[in-house]
Amino acid sequence: MKLNMTQLDMVRRQIDRVKAFEGGLYHKKYADITSADIQTAEDFLSLPFTEKDELRAVYPLGIQAVPDRDIVRIHSSSGTTGTPIIIPYTQKDVDDWATMFARCYAMAGITPEDRIHITPGYGLWTAGIGFQLGCEKLGAMAVPMGPGNTDKQLKMMMDLKSTVLCATSSYALLLAEEIAKRGIGDQIHLKKGVIGSERWGDKMRARIAAELGVELYDIYGLTEIYGPGVGINCQKEEPMHYWDDFVYIEIIDPVTGQPVPDGEIGEIVITTLQKEGAPLIRYRTHDLSRIVPEPCSCGSAFPRIDRIIGRSDDMIKVKGVNIYPGQVEDVLKNVAGVSSEYQVMIDHLNGRDIMTLFFEVEPEADRELVEIAVGAIFKAKVGLTIV
């Protein structure tokens, strides 16, 4: 999906701003680039990618693009895989984030009448505060629980009659199991769940929806790009609408870096169009998805990407075939009798790649028949024989 002229103008303004801020990441990175160089969508593709390692290299505040007096808060990545990335926000950034998140809630059919139970963490992490910002912008009641303390979570959920649950998929499943175990389902008033942060398969999705009795929505975002709230699926279809007046999304081949045709799976690359505190241009997220070119039956004109199927850095190559975790899940979800738990093991023996797939079979299923079915579908869909 090419940049339109409005987005192109916004990109040029971003280039002027980031180049003008001495000491910032792009002041040096774009030393030989000017906004006048970017006259077309094709010119935009000549801009270099921005990589996560570049953001880590300028820790703590090297990606800041405005004076300190304009910064009202910071958030940070966890730093579990390396140096944390600190993201500065201006007041406009915070307000824009709230606007995007409120759109997400509205897209899911959530209204000011709802009571929104927020379980993701607060503090430096963007999740909890992002869910709350959008809730307050929408005008709904925020119940800012944060993570943990299941007894307190369930008590507040019952006493306040919360109608929307915001959570990671694993925590939503834990709460669903606890509600079933305690036999308190008739005291729970949840109608919708907004789930983010973790990739989850269809079997897990169906289990949470059934046990909680809710409609589920996938919300997308990442710390470097505001946080959660960049996009969400609507009430009609599974792909996620994203807010292309705030972010431009392109999909590239993760190996060559070249754009792929709309509809093909590749790596998401994001350019922020209005961000002030820490704008990013052509930022490689390593998340895998595709542009969904067909118009949505909900009538929204906002463009769409498909659910995240994995990460380009999770890719493994077996016998010359690129395999992503999402492809394994796609196979398993189509075989009756297979649970949502699986493990893939890759061995290299005598010059040959051997892929072993371990998965759980539901108690009532015929294990031998299930194994045959999984092998056949994997061969047909992925092109590999598994053992």
Where are these regions (language model features)?
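Short glycine-enriched loops at secondary-structure junctions
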Residues: 94, 121-123, 170-171
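Active-site glycine/GP-rich loop and adjacent strand/helix microenvironment
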Residues: 1-19, 138-387
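Acidic/glycine-enriched edge-of-secondary-structure segments
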Residues: 82-96, 132-142, 159-166
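Short, conserved acidic/polar surface loops in the N-terminal third of protein domains
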Residues: 86-90, 110, 127-130, 176
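Nucleotide 5′-phosphate-binding alpha/beta core
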Residues: 1-76, 82-99, 103-107, 188, ...
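Short secondary-structure capping/junction motifs at helix and strand boundaries
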Residues: 84-88, 109-115, 142-145, 217
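Conserved AMP-binding loop of ANL adenylate-forming enzymes
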Residues: 106-140
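Conserved ATP-dependent adenylate/AMP-binding module captured primarily in the ANL superfamily
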Residues: 42-45, 98-115, 150-162
